[in-house]
A protein has these predicted regions:
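Tandem repeat scaffolds
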Residues: 4-18, 24-187
Length: 187
């Protein structure tokens, strides 16, 4: 099954392609622009690569398996959104709002999560290589089993995050962080 195109997806009686065009005008401050409100939208398995959703409202949206590579989502509200197995590689999500979002098994390498609210988000088994989590709120976030090689966690309070089973040996950690070794199983 291939990815769905924006022109074939509808939300609240409007074509997604039209919503995205109006949002682009809004983002540029041009006449006729309207902020995209895609709260609760079914955008699963959609091809949204490179789309500008800066400041868009995507609360509770279903983006499972969606291609958002190289997208622009700074300041977007993705609270409680389903991003399971989504492709977010090299996406800018600076200051986005994602509390309670599900990013299980997401391809999120190279994502800019700078100063994001990721509280209680689920990143289990996600690919998070080379992500920037500087200044992000990760309280209650679940990273267990995630690939976080070369992740930037400086200026991030990770005390409330579940990092079990995560290899942080190549990550840039907060000052004073002492890696805790996993207990060794007897041979």
């Amino acid at each position: 099954m291939g990815l769905r195109r924006a022109k074939s997806i509808r939300h609240n009686g409007k074509r997604l392609q039209e919503i995205l065009a109006a949002h682009e005008l809004f983002f540029r401050g041009q006449e006729g622009g309207v902020r995209a409100n895609l709260a609760g939208a079914d955008l699963s398995h959609a091809d949204l690569a490179g789309v500008n959703l800066s400041g868009a409202i995507l609360r509770g949206a279903n983006l499972e398996g969606t291609d958002l590579r190289r997208g622009k989502l700074p300041g977007a509200d993705l609270s409680g959104a389903n991003l399971r197995k989504a492709d977010l590689r090299n996406t800018d999500m600076t200051e986005s709002i994602l509390p309670g979002a599900d990013l299980t098994e997401a391809q999120a390498s190279g994502v800019e999560f700078f100063r994001c609210d990721l509280s209680n988000a689920n990143f289990q088994r996600a690919h998070l290589r080379n992500v920037n989590l500087r200044g992000a709120n990760v309280n209650g976030a679940k990273f267990s089993g995630a690939d976080m090689g070369v992740a930037i966690l400086r200026e991030t309070d990770i005390t409330g995050a579940d990092l079990s089973g995560v290899d942080l040996s190549t990550a840039l950690m907060p000052r004073g962080y002492a890696a805790q070794k996993s207990p060794q199983k007897p041979a």
